[in-house]
Amino acid sequence: MYWESKRNNDQKSLSVDLLDGHYHSKGENKHDTYEVHVAKAHSEYDFIFLSVSHGFVKEALEILRKNNVKGTLVFFCNFWNTRKEVEEWAGDYVYILAFPTAGGQMQDDHLDGVLFDYLMLEGEQKAYISNYTDLTALLTSADLKWEVPHDMVEWIWIHMAINTGVTSTAARSGNLENPEQLALNLMNSSSELSLAIKVIREALKVVEARGVNLKLYKAELLPYKIPAWIAGKAMKIMFAKNELTRKIMTLHNDKQDIFYCCQSVYQTGQELGVKIPILEANMKGISL
């Protein structure tokens, strides 16, 4: 399915440039044309992958309901909401939470993207969908692996906290009109990356204050436990050598989405009385 509120329903195709990390760690550059098939009213699908920018989830679901489009929902995007709120969004739809390790940007009829070889997927016991094995079979057929975190909602919050540390540090020094250059500046500076590590730690305190036991996510959070100056140097080397990660950083140019992520974490931190001085300073420096 293809849905985006800003797109023209008469659009027939998209040109796609993809750095594909499926089979090679450095990625392969691929180009193709994606044929757009707009879902018809009263149609039914095995799965509906819902991957939209912040604030569009409810709107997308209303369009699906209005057109009586049915199928198992796969939420494939960031959100700072609770599981109860997600359940309210879904309503009568059965759903599962997942998150792609992919990214990119859309300009006119062209998609420039990066794809890794795995994604995050809610465990079968928490998903409550009858076609879980069909979904994993679909992923396998596309040569995609998956990881199952302790809790998918909590994992997304953690992911947003990490993003907040990185993007708020990048954005504090300039206008978000040019996020690509801000990302490059950050990745080329070990001192700025060290600062980002410190902000990530503050942002994770906000997640913890929401009731998340961070000890259940030791593997994901281990890189942020080592001394910040060492982590900053390691991250600089990683960005220099890992083209997939480097490109996904430079392609992330949705400034409203970036601001939504940072503002959500920052505002919750203030509401819960969490001390986040570096993040607060970063937020004051961000200019849309």
Task: Identify the meaning behind each predicted range.
Residues 26-112:
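Rossmann-like NAD(P)(H) cofactor-binding subdomain of soluble oxidoreductases
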